[in-house]
Amino acid sequence: MTNYYGHNIVIIGLGITGITCVNFFRSRGITPRVMDTRYNPPQLNQLPKDIQYWLGELKIEWLLAATLIVISPGISLSHPAINTAMKCGIEIIGDVELFLREVTVPVVAITGTNGKSTVAKLVGTMANCAGLKVGVGGNIGYPVLSLLQQSHQLYVLELSSFQLETTKNLKVAVATILNISEDHMDRYPLGLQQYREAKLKIYKQAKIYIINDDDKLTLPANSTNKEYCSIIKFGIKSGHYCLGDYQGKQWLMAYGKPLLDCNEIKIIGRHNLLNALAALALAEAIAIPRQACLIALRQFSGLMHRFELVLERKGIRWINDSKATNVGSTKAALNELTVDGTLHLLLGGDGKLADFSSLQPFVQGNNIHLYCFGKDSKKLAALNQHSATITQTLSQAMHIINNQVKAGDVVLLSPACSSLDQFENFKVRGKTFTNLVFEFNDGNNN
């Protein structure tokens, strides 16, 4: 356990992550100070009464007096006040760094633009099926410091690029970058390579690398240094874990041998088969028995808001892919669809300065109509001007679709954007979609 006695600690951010940091230090007899750029941060009412706090801006005097600053992922290191503190030599870390300083059991670290939560949860399920006491947390929605409240034999962490930026001690058992495509360009003004470099930090001290053989951007610079690391690869057609034909069907393969008929897996889509392969590779790296992995794959039904079939009724499929907060994720969803009638595609939100142009080939044709809402609705509608409807809100778009949809059609919410311009998070956006689906189908569609 790291000793923070005598430190002047400032915590930046009073969301769920920030309040767990406050509780972490309080449990060790340390009273931190807290600040947030928001005037009404979500966890303000959870803050103990004796904790000093500052709202609306970052108080530079507190920062420069600190010996340790713990920053939440939502605050950029490029913020002028943070930059000033860094130049003064003040240590700035995140909650993941605090967590890793405390644990002594193996840690699985997972990042990537898309699929992180699914793979993290799947590896956790595999460990559970093997009888291991496993803690799953991080960017998946469960703060890592909360995992310390119970003892575990293994930790599985989903890590965002923002979390990796503020983590120094990444001595993990195994690490992977599932894929890399453009995302969060509002935080990475130098472009994709800057974003990629943040992701690549996950490999720095890992004992084993799990590499996506289909995505060369995920390849670490020292991957050929055999003395430094061990590598397991996964991919659609190549890698130690890949897809293959066996007895006339598509199977998950391991080292050229058939493992599991893909028809036995509940999660749908080619991208989820790739997620399953990645999970198997990670499980091998930490010696989870193969049989437990196969049981988990047969049981695992996926996570909400991720290419989730909400309802199929009267020949119409309604799919909630609200977690598609970037172009790459929406492209993956569109690759999975076979549509007999018309695809009604809901796009919109805050694109985070993304370039939408690579989405254009996916949204052409006579059997697709775009419904674009939110901050970047006009940019998205320009992808197919002849077949796009612009609305202010998701709800307005859904009501238009409900009056037009017919048997053979698919309604897909896969926004390619963040939800934060109009919703608290992607979950609320997905729930709004789902509620409208059932409202339509329990009412005027029955």
Curated annotation (Swiss-Prot):
Binding site for ATP: G112, T113, N114, G115, K116, S117, T118
SUPFAM superfamilies: MurCD N-terminal domain, MurD-like peptide ligases, catalytic domain, MurD-like peptide ligases, peptide-binding domain
A biological process term (GO) from this entry: cell wall organization
Compartments where located: Cytoplasm
EC number, as in UniProt: 6.3.2.9
MF-aspect GO terms: ATP binding; UDP-N-acetylmuramoylalanine-D-glutamate ligase activity
UniProt-listed InterPro entries: Mur-like_cat_sf, Mur_ligase_C, Mur_ligase_C_dom_sf, Mur_ligase_cen, MurD
Reactions that this protein is recorded to catalyse: UDP-N-acetyl-alpha-D-muramoyl-L-alanine + D-glutamate + ATP = UDP-N-acetyl-alpha-D-muramoyl-L-alanyl-D-glutamate + ADP + phosphate + H(+)
Protein name: UDP-N-acetylmuramoylalanine--D-glutamate ligase
Organism (species): Baumannia cicadellinicola subsp. Homalodisca coagulata
Lineage: Bacteria, Pseudomonadati, Pseudomonadota, Gammaproteobacteria, Candidatus Palibaumannia
